[in-house]
UniProtKB/Swiss-Prot annotation:
Species assigned in the record: Streptococcus equi subsp. equi (strain 4047)
Family: Belongs to the RecX family.
Listed GO CC annotations: cytoplasm
Protein name as catalogued: Regulatory protein RecX
Function comment: Modulates RecA activity.
Gene: recX
Keyword list, A-Z: Cytoplasm
Amino acid sequence: MKISQIEKKKHLYLIKLDNGDSLTVTEDTIVTFMLSKHMVIDSQQWEDIKSFAQFSYGKSKALGFIAFQQRSQKQVQDYLLKHQISPDLIPSIIDSLKQGKWIDDQQYVDTYIRQNSLTGDKGPLLLKQKLMLKGIASQLIEPVLAQTDFSSIAQKAAEKIYQKYQHKLPSKALTDKIIQGLLNKGFSYDLAKGIVSQLSLEQDSQHIEDLLDQEFDKLLRKYSRRYDGYQLKQKLYQALYRKGYDSDDITTKLNDYF
């Protein structure tokens, strides 16, 4: 067999043989086999070229995927499968990328956690969950988490929640909101409690009274359509207490109204 034509197609090349066969290959395939027009090849060479072309194309797709953003090994594997690269070729493509340091799950973990320390707000539990969803083994994650101080990250996250709700919630509800917010972000309960204890959550009595008045009026409109008398009073008390208002303050408010 003889190569009758080599035609460039964007980033790939179309190779045509004189027997009518054709194959689209990467530039790496051209260079590796030193392919040129009029070159004579046998059937075994042609099979080798086709096999390498598939490998090279898959590797090229993977390199494009990781060119501008670091990826885990599983992310690259999933990407190749999605783009219909043969499952039989993927292990060799991954090995080649790992040898070239294009894929390194340990480095991925280090970078991910370091970036969170600089600009993120996630705790260790959430970080571990997200990294494991990317296919990274826990034994690569846990040592890095153990060496990371999360107190300053939790502090910033707590202050952000505080700023959002300080004018909307009474002290107890605000405390619960901050702790729950930190738990949702993957921080431990002990750390969340410790961080909250360092915050100044005291509110002046007038502010608390204003909040209570607003919440009372809103709940009164809601419950007065269905309840009255003692039942209404009980519903209001329970709802206000659940929202974190002090029992004595609620009782005073209810006695003033009823």
